[in-house]
Amino acid sequence: MASFLKISTLIAIVSTLQTTLAAPPACLLACVAKVEKGSKCSGLNDLSCICTTKNSDVEKCLKEICPNGDADTAISAFKSSCSGYSSQSSSSESESESASSEESSASASASASSSAGKSSNVEASTTKESSSAKASSSAAGSSEAVSSATETASTEESSSAAASASASASATKESSSEAASSTSSTLKESKTSTTAAASSSESTTATGVLTQSEGSAAKVGLGALVGLVGAVLL
């Protein structure tokens, strides 16, 4: 169906060109058919579509494939065939431009409204952020104060602990000194007792030796006396 419409449209274009120009160049027909085939123009408005949207493509094709003498003739024939559609194209373009300007105005209004809304949102967000920042700074100040108080208390506790440790060390040194002194005194007394005991033992031993010597001498004297008496009696 689409191919039939294109063929019928091409026939209509050829007949239009023939009424405009008695004998249109063959290259003109070839270029119109080529451009119409590669474009989106279809239906009964093919010639209008080609004249308004593809006229530059047709002229370029004519300059490329038409002989030198036929190119200008073909371009003139194409322009004369599209003369009625060019005025329609101008009115369509003006309508499109007015519609575009209206759309631009509407877009500008919408953009302005959107910008105003965004500005309000930004201001509200900025206010909230300021409040949040103040609350955060207050909380940070409170936290710093608590931290400072905690550090002070920790420092005081550390000082007290250090003082207690120093006192304990002093007490330990004094106890060690007293224990050393007591041990030294005990050792001295023990040495003195040992010396006295040794002296007493030596004295006792000497006395025993002297007593034993004296007993032996008495026994010897008594024996001599008994012998002397026995000799006298004999």
Curated annotation (Swiss-Prot):
Signal sequence residues: 1-22
Disulfide bonds: 27-66, 31-61, 41-49, 51-82
Region Disordered, residue ranges: 86-208
Domain of life per record: Eukaryota
Compartments (UniProt record): Secreted, Cell wall; Membrane
Disruption phenotype: Leads to increased sensitivity to caspofungin, Congo red, calcofluor white, and zymolyase.
Record Pfam families: CFEM
Entry annotated with the keyword Signal: yes
Major localisation: secreted
Keyword Signal among record annotations: yes
Comp. bias regions, Low complexity: 86-207
UniProt entry keywords in alphabetical sequence: Cell wall, Disulfide bond, Glycoprotein, GPI-anchor, Heme, Iron, Lipoprotein, Membrane, Metal-binding, Secreted, Signal
GO CC terms of this entry: cell surface; extracellular region; fungal-type cell wall; plasma membrane; side of membrane; yeast-form cell wall
Induction line: Expressed in both yeast and hyphal cells at the same level, indicating that it has no morphological differential expression. Expression is slightly increased by fluconazole.
Protein name per the record: Covalently-linked cell wall protein 14
Organism name: Candida albicans (strain SC5314 / ATCC MYA-2876) (Yeast)
